[in-house]
């Protein structure tokens, strides 16, 4: 239902009006999902990787300092360290975190964490 908003974000990224910033752990998460949670053929996985490269994500390395902050955030807000990593990265880079996770937005209640429908 929110695919149009997601397409706008991707289009803005392609047009260099917005940048999509992600922690490098997204690469492991996607690779793991494609390898263990789907029945994608090797060809499909290869195409997914090509598509991912074309999106031109700004991939930020995860540091021990970021993980320390994510752990503290995770405990305070009762969210996963994985999700907290995105919050800490967005906060540190002074950018918005856009998510389709209603529960997460309501749980953290931070002004820079926006629901995809607000984009």
What are these regions (language model features)?
Residues 1, 24-26, 46-75:
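Acidic catalytic patch
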Residues 1-22, 37-46, 119:
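Short, well-structured N-terminal submotif of metal-dependent ribonuclease cores
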Residues 21-22, 61, 81-84, 99:
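Short beta-strand scaffold positions
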Residues 26, 66, 86, 103-104:
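Alpha-helix capping/helix-boundary segments
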Residues 60, 87-119:
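Acidic, PIN/NYN-like endoribonuclease modules and their adjacent C-terminal/linker elements
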